[in-house]
Amino acid sequence: MFRITDFTYEGKTVFLRADLNSPVEKGRITSDARFRAVLPTIQHLLDNGAKLVIATHQSRPYKGDYITTEEHAQILSRLLGQEVEYVEDIFGKYARERISSLKPGEAIILENLRFSAEEVFNRSIEECEKTFFVRKLAPLIDYVVNDAFATAHRSQPSLVGFARLKPMIMGKLMETEVDALSKAYESEERPRVYVLGGAKVDDSLRVAENVLRKGKADLILTGGLVGQIFTLAKGFDLGDANIEFLHRKGLLELVDWAEKILDEFYPYVRTPVDFAIDYKGERLEVDLLGGEKRLFDQYPILDIGSRTVEKYREILIGAKIIVANGPMGVFEREEFAVGTVGVFRAIGESPAFSVVGGGHSIASIYRYNITGISHISTGGGAMLSFFAGEELPVLKALKISYERFKDRVKE
């Protein structure tokens, strides 16, 4: 795959696909974390004389955070110390004229890509190549730089459609992500411990199955809803209140899959030995084998318990490789952040090379000032797909583009 230093950019028009999809409250962006993550790429391109066309999506139609990229332009302008012009168009006449009139060192950002219907669907590279978006913009572009790792598991026109038409290059963030995740996945150092939590149970089961079957993991520690599904798969009763919640979420049907994983890899999958419930507005820890587990019938599980945290901590401190995705509980409520904070602090204190991803995981790391983690990934679904052994469409497109244009390096 091409790296950003493989080409010179003076006077060249560069289409930069970033992922600036950010949390929004009351119509305003509340975090600039994703903007800061792509700054090194943007700065490199501008410093080297590129005419820069930035593009991103923001949410999806009919959701509350589905807004224009006008504020994205303002945030980028502030962080860069130079104007990034908001272009209220995607591939229409106005956008094309503005791209054609760019001067070296100038930057614009196109309108929210998902305002275009073509950008909402996943399609093959061949189909994406034929979209109006790609056909209209390709003649105006010299290079495509992709820094949207968080969207690398999607196959949409802006992400893969230019791969066979123009050199498609990894941005600095993409390069860092691919290098870190590959190091964790391919490492032969042991023990290799995966921590799977949160609510993306099906994705986590795919990861567990893949890394255990391929010998990439020595132990899997579970929490969040992933931990509850594996606990049920081991034959424990989590009570009516929690069974009903999992049923409403459509997760009970995944218990059979978890059982199959346990049938094959039982000793390597660890589940919580205690849980914390919301007992009349307060945290109450209940041992899975204790007499108080009848409380599970009435009160929801919102975290793993302290005994589980200690057991997990011992394992993590002795690990050589750690991959973690998803929180251990409802960390947004401070009394139920014990599991998430305890486990992530242990990861930070461990001498292991560690990779942590997922939006909620990252939020908890920053909220509780957890340090010492080797790599915090911007990808949630993309990271899970990577460790599930799936080929990410954007990485596939980068490889295809490299094979097609490798003779043009340093032109």
Curated annotation (Swiss-Prot):
Keywords: ATP-binding, Cytoplasm, Glycolysis, Kinase, Nucleotide-binding, Transferase. ATP binds at residues 332, 358-361. Its main location: cytoplasm. GO terms for molecular function: ADP binding; ATP binding; phosphoglycerate kinase activity. Its EC number is 2.7.2.3. Pfam families: PGK. It comes from the Archaea. One of its GO terms (biological process) is glycolytic process. PROSITE patterns: PGLYCERATE_KINASE. It is an enzyme of class 2 (transferase). Pathway: Carbohydrate degradation; glycolysis; pyruvate from D-glyceraldehyde 3-phosphate: step 2/5. It catalyses: (2R)-3-phosphoglycerate + ATP = (2R)-3-phospho-glyceroyl phosphate + ADP. InterPro entries: Phosphoglycerate_kinase (IPR001576), Phosphoglycerate_kinase_CS (IPR015911), Phosphoglycerate_kinase_N (IPR015824), Phosphoglycerate_kinase_sf (IPR036043). It is found in: Cytoplasm. GO terms for cellular component: cytosol. Substrate binds at residues 19-21, 34, 57-60, 114, 154. The keyword Nucleotidyltransferase does not apply. Belongs to the phosphoglycerate kinase family. Monomer. This is Phosphoglycerate kinase. It comes from Thermococcus kodakarensis (strain ATCC BAA-918 / JCM 12380 / KOD1) (Pyrococcus kodakaraensis (strain KOD1)). The lineage of its organism: Archaea, Methanobacteriati, Methanobacteriota, Thermococci, Thermococcales.
